[in-house]
Amino acid sequence: MKNALEIVTFKIKDGVKLPDFLKASAELEEGFAKKQEGFLSRTFARREGNEWVDVIRWQTMADAEAASKAAMQSTACAPMFGMIDEPSVKMMHFEVLS
Protein backbone atom coordinates (compact mmCIF):
# COMPACT_ATOMS: atom_id res chain seq x y z
CA MET A 1 0.00 0.00 0.00
CA LYS A 2 1.10 3.52 -0.73
CA ASN A 3 1.43 6.24 1.86
CA ALA A 4 -0.80 9.30 1.76
CA LEU A 5 -0.12 12.97 2.34
CA GLU A 6 -2.68 15.24 3.93
CA ILE A 7 -1.92 18.84 3.01
CA VAL A 8 -3.88 21.65 4.61
CA THR A 9 -3.28 25.32 3.83
CA PHE A 10 -4.91 28.10 5.83
CA LYS A 11 -4.60 31.48 7.52
CA ILE A 12 -5.02 32.19 11.21
CA LYS A 13 -7.61 34.63 12.50
CA ASP A 14 -6.66 38.24 13.16
CA GLY A 15 -5.63 38.80 16.75
CA VAL A 16 -4.35 35.27 17.39
CA LYS A 17 -1.00 35.39 19.16
CA LEU A 18 1.73 33.23 17.66
CA PRO A 19 2.76 31.53 20.95
CA ASP A 20 -0.87 30.56 21.60
CA PHE A 21 -1.25 29.16 18.09
CA LEU A 22 1.99 27.17 18.26
CA LYS A 23 0.93 25.72 21.62
CA ALA A 24 -2.43 24.67 20.16
CA SER A 25 -0.63 23.10 17.19
CA ALA A 26 1.63 21.10 19.51
CA GLU A 27 -1.42 19.93 21.48
CA LEU A 28 -3.09 18.79 18.26
CA GLU A 29 0.02 16.81 17.29
CA GLU A 30 0.64 15.19 20.68
CA GLY A 31 -2.96 14.82 21.81
CA PHE A 32 -4.46 13.70 18.53
CA ALA A 33 -2.36 13.15 15.39
CA LYS A 34 0.34 10.94 16.89
CA LYS A 35 -2.34 8.73 18.46
CA GLN A 36 -4.10 8.02 15.17
CA GLU A 37 -3.61 4.74 13.35
CA GLY A 38 -1.18 5.12 10.46
CA PHE A 39 0.41 8.41 11.59
CA LEU A 40 3.97 8.66 10.26
CA SER A 41 5.06 12.31 10.46
CA ARG A 42 3.96 15.94 10.52
CA THR A 43 5.56 19.08 9.08
CA PHE A 44 4.13 22.46 10.00
CA ALA A 45 5.30 25.66 8.28
CA ARG A 46 4.40 29.24 7.44
CA ARG A 47 5.42 32.01 5.10
CA GLU A 48 4.85 35.74 4.89
CA GLY A 49 1.30 36.89 4.48
CA ASN A 50 -0.14 34.69 7.25
CA GLU A 51 -0.05 31.59 5.03
CA TRP A 52 0.37 28.25 6.80
CA VAL A 53 0.71 24.65 5.67
CA ASP A 54 0.26 21.48 7.70
CA VAL A 55 1.52 18.29 6.04
CA ILE A 56 0.86 14.90 7.64
CA ARG A 57 2.12 11.63 6.18
CA TRP A 58 -0.09 8.60 6.78
CA GLN A 59 0.50 4.91 6.08
CA THR A 60 -2.60 4.69 3.87
CA MET A 61 -5.23 6.92 2.33
CA ALA A 62 -7.82 5.22 4.54
CA ASP A 63 -5.80 6.26 7.62
CA ALA A 64 -5.67 9.86 6.37
CA GLU A 65 -9.39 9.99 5.69
CA ALA A 66 -10.31 8.40 9.03
CA ALA A 67 -8.09 10.82 10.94
CA SER A 68 -9.58 13.80 9.10
CA LYS A 69 -13.07 12.76 10.15
CA ALA A 70 -12.02 12.05 13.74
CA ALA A 71 -10.24 15.41 14.03
CA MET A 72 -13.54 17.26 13.68
CA GLN A 73 -14.77 15.61 16.90
CA SER A 74 -11.49 15.83 18.84
CA THR A 75 -11.14 18.08 21.87
CA ALA A 76 -7.36 18.05 21.27
CA CYS A 77 -7.90 19.67 17.85
CA ALA A 78 -10.55 22.21 18.87
CA PRO A 79 -8.21 24.93 20.23
CA MET A 80 -6.14 25.08 17.03
CA PHE A 81 -9.19 24.81 14.77
CA GLY A 82 -10.77 27.72 16.65
CA MET A 83 -7.83 29.97 15.74
CA ILE A 84 -7.97 29.21 12.01
CA ASP A 85 -9.80 31.41 9.52
CA GLU A 86 -12.24 28.77 8.27
CA PRO A 87 -12.92 30.23 4.79
CA SER A 88 -9.18 30.12 4.05
CA VAL A 89 -8.84 26.37 4.67
CA LYS A 90 -7.95 24.11 1.76
CA MET A 91 -7.51 20.41 2.55
CA MET A 92 -6.16 17.87 0.08
CA HIS A 93 -5.14 14.21 0.21
CA PHE A 94 -2.50 12.83 -2.14
CA GLU A 95 -1.22 9.33 -2.83
CA VAL A 96 2.58 9.19 -2.39
CA LEU A 97 4.25 7.87 -5.52
CA SER A 98 7.91 8.11 -4.53
What spans do the regions from the language model cover?
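Short beta-strand-to-loop capping motifs
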Residues: 9-14, 56-58
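Small-side-chain structural scaffolding
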Residues: 4, 8, 64-67
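Short, charged/polar surface micro-motifs in flexible loops or helix N-caps
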Residues: 14, 50, 60-64
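An amphipathic, aromatic/His-enriched active-site/gating alpha helix that lines ligand/cofactor pockets
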Residues: 27, 31-40, 57-92
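Short, surface-exposed ligand-recognition loops at beta-strand->loop->(often short) alpha-helix junctions
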Residues: 11-23
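Glycine-rich beta-strand-turn "strand-cap" elements at beta-sheet edges
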Residues: 1-4, 10-13, 40-51, 76-98
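Short acidic, gly/pro-rich beta-turn/loop elements at beta-sheet edges
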Residues: 18-20, 52, 64-66
